Swiss-Prot record:
F-type ATPases have 2 components, CF(1) - the catalytic core - and CF(0) - the membrane proton channel. CF(1) has five subunits: alpha(3), beta(3), gamma(1), delta(1), epsilon(1). CF(0) has three main subunits: a(1), b(2) and c(9-12). The alpha and beta chains form an alternating ring which encloses part of the gamma chain. CF(1) is attached to CF(0) by a central stalk formed by the gamma and epsilon chains, while a peripheral stalk is formed by the delta and b chains. The gene is atpD. It is a peripheral membrane protein. HAMAP family: ATP_synth_beta_bact. Produces ATP from ADP in the presence of a proton gradient across the membrane. The catalytic sites are hosted primarily by the beta subunits. It holds the Pfam family ATP-synt_VA_C. It comes from Pseudarthrobacter chlorophenolicus (strain ATCC 700700 / DSM 12829 / CIP 107037 / JCM 12360 / KCTC 9906 / NCIMB 13794 / A6) (Arthrobacter chlorophenolicus). ATP binds at residues 168-175. It comes from the Bacteria. This is ATP synthase subunit beta. GO terms for cellular component: plasma membrane; proton-transporting ATP synthase complex.
Length: 484
């Protein structure tokens, strides 16, 4: 007998079913006809493996008919057998919210990983599946979020209350830049931060935990992890768990919140795995047919309401450096600012390896950032673009064959490229150089001076991996001293 909508309404928490089939993380469960769980309901069962009893949680994903539901396990299914009883919780997965989550690490189910549940002061839990804020309650923002990183503040200014994407292939510095942003923005921000580790390395999660503790921001931060070794169902839902915690701070405590997600591609990848496990026909390049829908359900909840904001910074892995891949391409449409990391720039040792010509921002406009800032950003991009166009001629004929005007362009472009690099706090352990923060005023003045030719007398190596113009002058004095 196939369950009907009327019978779904009758389903209540505590209804018990039995496992009919287990295929990896996919579990089919048979329930009584009048107690079919709703889609997204959490199901639980207890198993004993190697003398240890543990609870396994599933999420209802499909109604198959004949009283069967298909669920995705959020933990390893080792030890599950047919006939094991399963209990319907009657509600979706929920996570703890409120001040009690600050300073702690949680998994997708809201279970603490650093302390026992009895040590937490939790009075409220929210379901992770929630509607986006009503259209009338939304509020746009054009206020710039200053980071102190020259290349970002000048060419791809971030928006307070906006969605920011850090795009890049493997090994170009996405996670380091996210960690740098946490160190800089969270420390200066003074509000609440939530970090979602989606399908990334467990080692990086531990590094982040230690760095946040050292930076003094851990006490105001909640961390939610679903790492690489977790089942796809966990990796698909962990971003929603973290977002739910952030929404509570925004909607109930009326706070401005920072939400860091690393990595959105792993969220998409987990959705593709779950879609395949559920037997859906794949779409382009093997991704799930509802890729845009899944991305929209997440991104539309990351928004600012009247008076309060969620500012999100999301790392997005670009497979094979292909920006036309459906995963990064689907994410682009939701973002207010995009920072694209270049393998070619990283190969020259220039960090952060931000591509100044392809990175964008919605507020790179004189009415939002001022005429001086905008004009300097445009001049910098024009010089870099002209230099890029001249590279083929230089490769064939050499720099000496260029016109005097073009030689000046190339010379200033090289200084700009070096000056866009900057020593960061996160990289100090590798470089031994203290990080620097440059105000937007000093950044604009510095690049204006380069574009105007005021610094043509300074060797380009003096601009490498420094902060403001004062650092350039000190570096230049050192170079002159060494060459005497």
């Amino acid at each position: 007998m196939t369950a009907t909508a009327t019978e779904h309404v009758a389903a209540t928490s505590g209804a018990t079913g039995r496992i009919a089939r287990v295929i990896g993380p996919v579990v089919d469960v048979e329930f009584p006809a009048d107690a079919i769980p709703s889609i997204y309901n959490a199901l639980t069962t207890e198993i004993t493996l190697n003398g240890e009893t543990k609870t396994i949680t599933f999420e209802t994903s499909q109604h198959l008919g004949d009283n069967l539901v298909r669920a995705i396990s959020l933990q390893a299914t080792d030890g599950l057998v047919r006939g094991t009883s399963v209990v319907d919780s009657g509600a979706p997965i929920s996570v703890p919210v409120g001040d009690g989550v600050k300073g702690h690490i949680f998994n997708v189910l809201g279970q603490p990983l650093d302390v026992t549940e009895s040590e937490l002061d939790i009075s409220e839990r929210w379901p992770i599946h929630r509607k986006a804020p009503a259209f009338a309650s939304l509020e746009g923002s054009t206020e710039m979020l200053e980071t102190g990183i020259k290349v970002i503040d000048l060419l791809t200014p971030y928006i307070k209350g906006g969605k920011i994407g850090l795009f890049g292939g493997a090994g170009v510095g996405k996670t380091v830049l996210i960690q740098e942003m946490i160190t800089r923005v969270a420390r200066n921000f003074g509000g609440t931060s939530v970090f979602a580790g989606v399908g990334e390395r467990t080692r990086e999660g531990n590094d982040l935990w230690v760095e946040m503790e050292e930076a003094g921001v851990l006490k105001d931060t909640a961390l939610v992890f679903g790492q690489m070794d977790e089942p796809p169902g966990t990796r698909l839902r962990v971003a929603l768990s973290a977002l739910t915690m952030a929404e509570y701070f925004r909607d109930v405590q009326n706070q401005d919140v920072l939400l860091f997600i690393d990595n959105i591609f792993r969220f998409t990848q987990a959705g593709s795995e779950v879609s395949t496990l559920l037997g859906r026909m794949p779409s382009a390049v093997g991704y799930q047919p509802n890729l845009a829908d899944e991305m929209g359900l997440l991104q539309e909840r990351i928004t600012s309401t009247k008076g309060h904001s969620i500012t999100s910074m999301q790392a997005i892995y670009v497979p094979a450096d292909d920006y036309t891949d459906p995963a990064p391409a689907t994410t682009f449409a939701h973002l207010d600012a995009t920072t694209e990391l270049s393998r070619e720039i990283a190969s020259r040792g220039l960090y952060p390896a931000v591509d100044p010509l392809t990175s964008t921002s919605r507020i790179l406009d004189p009415q939002y950032i001022g005429k001086d800032h905008y004009n300097t950003a445009v001049r910098v991009k024009q010089i870099l673009q002209k230099n890029k166009e001249l590279q083929d001629i230089i490769a064939i004929l050499g720099v000496d064959e260029l016109s005097e005007e073009d030689k000046i362009v190339v010379s200033r472009a090289r200084r700009i490229q070096q000056f866009l690099s900057q020593n960061t706090y996160t990289a100090k352990q590798f470089t031994g150089v203290e990080g620097s923060t440059v105000s937007i005023k000093d950044t604009v003045e510095g690049f204006t001076a380069i574009c105007d030719g005021e610094l043509d007398h300074i060797a380009e190596q003096a601009f490498f991996n420094v902060g403001g113009l004062d650092d350039v002058e000190r570096q230049w004095a050192k170079i002159q001293e060494q060459t005497k």
